C-alpha cells in the first residue's frame, strides 16, 4: 500500500497536516474548495520564478489567510513591498473578503520534494541530460541532511521513441513507516518530444511524537534531521507509451 499511495495523504493527522485549514457549511464547502484551487493556480502561474513549495490557506471568520512557502521570497515581496501589496489586493478580489498574506522562506530548497521536482523539470526543458539532473539533485539533498531520496522520471526521456520510466535512489525511503517524515512532490516538463513527469520522495528522518504540525514546524525552523548515506541504487523499467 505504501508504495502506491500518496505519502503525504497517508500521514495526514499523524505527522502531517492539511494545506487548506478551514471548516464550512455544506452549502459553502464547494465554493470555498474551488476558490482554494483558483488561488493556488493563480499563484503558481504568477510566481513561477519564486520557487513556490506550497500554499497554505486558512479561513478565520469572514477572513482569508494565505501563507506562501517559497525559496525566493524577495521576488514575491518586491521593492519596498510593492509587489506583495498588489498580490494581496488581487487575492482580495478573488476571495471577496479581507485577505492577509504571509511569506515563509524555504531555507533548504534542496531537500524540499516539490522544489527538487520543479528544478529537475526545468532542467529537462532546457535539454539537460535527465541522468545528470537526477544525480545532481540526489547529491545536493544528501549533502544538506536528507536521510534518503528517490527520484522518478518518466516519458520520452532523451527524445526516445518509446516512453519509459527511470529512477535513482540514495539512502533509505521508508514509505510504509507512518512515523517517517517523507516529503513528496511532482512536476511536469514540457519538452519538444512531449510531457515528462517527475516524482520526488525525500526522507528527512523520523518524527516520534504524534503531532500533525510536527513536519511543518520542523521545516519552518530548519531542523531537518541529518542522516548518513546508505547504499546507492539505480533502476530502470520500460513502460509502454
Swiss-Prot record:
Domain KH type-2, residue spans: 39-107
MF-aspect GO terms: mRNA binding; rRNA binding; structural constituent of ribosome
Span list, region Disordered: 214-241
Signal sequence segment: none
Keyword Transmembrane helix: no
Swiss-Prot/TrEMBL GO biological process terms: translation
Quaternary context: Part of the 30S ribosomal subunit. Forms a tight complex with proteins S10 and S14.
Reported function: Binds the lower part of the 30S subunit head. Binds mRNA in the 70S ribosome, positioning it for translation.
Membership in a protein family: Belongs to the universal ribosomal protein uS3 family.
Name of protein: Small ribosomal subunit protein uS3
Originating species: Mesorhizobium japonicum (strain LMG 29417 / CECT 9101 / MAFF 303099) (Mesorhizobium loti (strain MAFF 303099))
Gene: rpsC
Amino acid at each position: 500500500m505504501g508504495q502506491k499511495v500518496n505519502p503525504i495523504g497517508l500521514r495526514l493527522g499523524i505527522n502531517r497536516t492539511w494545506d487548506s485549514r478551514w471548516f464550512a457549511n455544506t452549502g459553502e464547502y464547494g465554493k470555498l474548495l474551488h476558490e482554494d484551487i483558483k488561488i493556488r493556480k493563480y499563484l503558481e502561474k504568477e510566481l513561477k520564478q519564486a520557487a513556490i513549495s506550497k500554499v497554505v490557506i486558512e479561513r478565520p471568520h469572514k477572513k482569508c489567510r494565505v501563507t506562501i512557502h517559497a525559496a525566493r521570497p524577495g521576488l514575491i515581496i518586491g521593492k519596498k513591498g510593492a509587489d506583495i501589496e498588489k498580490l494581496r489586493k488581487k487575492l482580495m478580489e478573488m476571495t471577496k473578503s479581507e485577505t492577509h498574506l504571509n511569506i515563509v522562506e524555504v531555507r533548504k530548497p534542496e531537500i524540499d520534494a516539490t522544489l527538487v521536482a520543479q528544478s529537475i523539470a526545468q532542467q529537462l526543458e532546457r535539454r539537460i541530460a535527465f541522468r545528470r539532473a537526477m544525480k545532481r539533485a540526489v547529491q545536493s539533498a544528501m549533502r544538506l541532511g536528507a536521510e534518503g531520496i528517490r527520484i522518478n522520471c518518466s516519458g520520452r526521456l532523451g527524445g526516445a521513441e518509446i516512453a519509459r520510466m527511470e529512477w535513482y535512489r540514495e539512502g533509505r525511503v521508508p514509505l510504509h513507516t507512518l512515523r517517517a517524515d517523507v516529503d513528496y512532490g511532482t512536476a511536469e516538463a514540457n519538452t519538444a518530444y512531449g510531457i515528462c513527469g517527475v516524482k520526488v520522495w525525500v526522507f528527512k528522518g523520523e518524527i516520534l511524537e504524534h503531532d500533525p504540525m510536527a513536519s511543518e514546524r520542523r521545516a519552518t525552523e530548519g531542523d531537518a534531521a541529518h542522516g548518513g548515506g546508505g547504499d546507492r541504487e539505480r533502476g530502470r523499467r520500460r513502460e509502454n507509451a
